[in-house]
Amino acid sequence: MKIIRFGVSMPEDLLEKFDTIMEEKGYANRSEAIRDLVRDFIVRHEWEEGDKEVAGTITIVYNHDEADVVKELLDMQHDYVNEIISSLHVHMDEHNCLEVIVVKGKGSRVKTIAERLISLKGVKHGKLVMTTTGKELV
């Protein structure tokens, strides 16, 4: 892979903050940190397009005592068998459960799945985190 060198201009204060954070995170140099920022920018664009294949996790916390939440969660996971790769179930306490669902598919479809799961009655909190499949990322 050919590497291209280019210059970046920015205010000194901004660069100082960037350098501080870069060091805290353990980057060896600015180039590595900037490459990660550019990759993240590309991945976010893929999500926004909606037609690119993405991967991600849907994390939900729910009260398993709530009427039909467990049945609905399982039914929905079977409805999206092509996109839902795996799930992890954790008992947080005697009433609350944490479910981490690993998904892969078109961004728009993954968002729809997350919205449906998170909006179920009995779900106390939910979050979708999407990333790239890595196929189109350099």
From Swiss-Prot:
Its cofactor is Ni(2+). Ni(2+) binds at H78, H89, H91, C97. Gene3D superfamilies: ACT-like. Chain A, domain 2, Met repressor-like. Binds 1 nickel ion per subunit. One of its GO terms (biological process) is response to nickel cation. Transmembrane segments: none annotated. It comes from the Archaea. Signal peptide: none annotated. Keywords: DNA-binding, Metal-binding, Nickel, Transcription, Transcription regulation. The keyword Nucleus does not apply. Transcriptional regulator. Belongs to the transcriptional regulatory CopG/NikR family. This is Putative nickel-responsive regulator. It comes from Thermococcus sibiricus (strain DSM 12597 / MM 739).
